[in-house]
Regions:
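Anaerobic metallocofactor- and corrinoid-dependent redox/one-carbon enzyme cores
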Residues: 1-164, 168-169, 173-197, 201, ...
């Protein structure tokens, strides 16, 4: 990607800071809890020691998108049994979805108390620029404070906060961690809001020129929370694999648009056809054995803004969604 496009991108940290402030201000009504680590790093617990809420998850999803996306609730999922849906649109989708929302920062720490591991998402990634992706995007944000979202069911040790603050070039007290357990109601909501990001990541994996993607939106059912991590992880993946719908608007040739549509849907994967929890178990819970092409929306429309032609591929699979959601 040329730096000409990213040169016009604003700060994802500046854009999302008002959303973080509002989340903290409304903590009581959102059923989330605010605390601090010993080094001053702020913790927003959205489901570990508190109930959390769907609205908290919706807001956290917009924070993940760097303040450049909107997530609204509706009943147009396309599934009679699971009408509750989330509609996602991102301004500057490459920056919002890949430069902020994508969970690409691997964070870990091991001590006598055990091991902590999480994949960080949110605008803090663009401050640290630790991933190769940011070299390709030609983007690095600048800010005095930041936020990272972690899909975890326990608090991060202070050492992780120190590492993140150092990598971001900020004081530890200016760092916020938002914690969203996968099995929580806030967790299933913020994962559903990743439906467009999943499509953007797949486009990147398919080596489609990112600068040719000019806009996009997605819709997906919101998975019922699972009672345990494995069930919840399966359901949140399946919501997008079997129920996610995305439309991308591209500035490309018709051949490029058609090829992207045909290659993107989840049913192009050799692992498609079973709930994700079953697939994961069959590979002895080794995530890296799962076909990477599986992680895609169920149905895709690619519209060429030059010619006005649209190309559609994939399917919505109600039977597999019902099986995954335990109906």
């Amino acid at each position: 990607m040329s730096n000409e496009l990213s040169a016009n991108w604003g700060s994802v940290n500046a854009a999302c800071q008002p959303l973080v402030d509002a989340l903290v201000a409304d903590a009581q009504t959102l059923q989330i809890e605010i605390s601090t680590l010993t080094n001053g790093t702020r913790i927003i617990d959205a489901g570990i020691n508190c109930p959390g809420s769907l609205e908290a998850g919706r807001r956290i999803g917009e924070i993940c998108m760097g303040g450049l996306g909107t997530a609204t609730l509706g009943t147009n999922s396309g599934f009679a049994n699971w009408p509750w849906s989330v509609n996602v649109h991102a301004r500057t989708p490459v920056l919002s979805c890949l430069g902020s929302q994508y969970a690409g920062w691997s964070l870990s720490h091991k001590d006598d108390n055990g091991q902590f591991f999480a994949l960080g998402s949110g605008p803090g990634r663009a401050l640290a620029g630790r991933e190769e992706l940011f070299k390709e995007l030609g983007y690095k944000d600048q800010a005095d404070s930041t936020v990272i979202v972690l899909e975890v069911d326990k608090f991060p040790p202070v050492e992780v906060a120190e590492k993140v603050a150092e990598n971001c070039g900020i004081k530890a007290e200016n760092l916020t961690f938002i914690l969203t357990p996968t099995a929580s109601i806030a967790g299933v909501m913020q994962i559903a809001i990743r439906v467009l990001e999943v499509a953007m990541h797949k486009a990147h994996e398919l080596h489609f020129p990112l600068e040719k993607i000019v806009d996009g939106y997605g819709v997906t059912p919101v998975a019922p929370p699972g009672g345990d991590f494995m069930t919840a992880m399966g359901r949140t993946n399946d919501a997008i694999l079997f129920g996610g719908q995305v439309q991308l608007f591209v500035n490309a040739s018709d051949d490029e648009a058609k090829a992207l549509a045909e290659k993107m849907p989840s049913n192009t994967s050799s692992d498609y056809g079973r709930p994700f929890a079953e697939i994961f178990k069959s590979y002895d819970y080794d995530f890296f054995k799962v076909d990477g092409m599986l992680f895609s929306p169920g149905k895709v429309i690619v519209t060429n803004v030059n010619t006005g032609k649209s190309f559609s591929a994939g399917e919505l699979n109600q039977a597999l969604l019902n099986q995954s959601f335990s109906l």
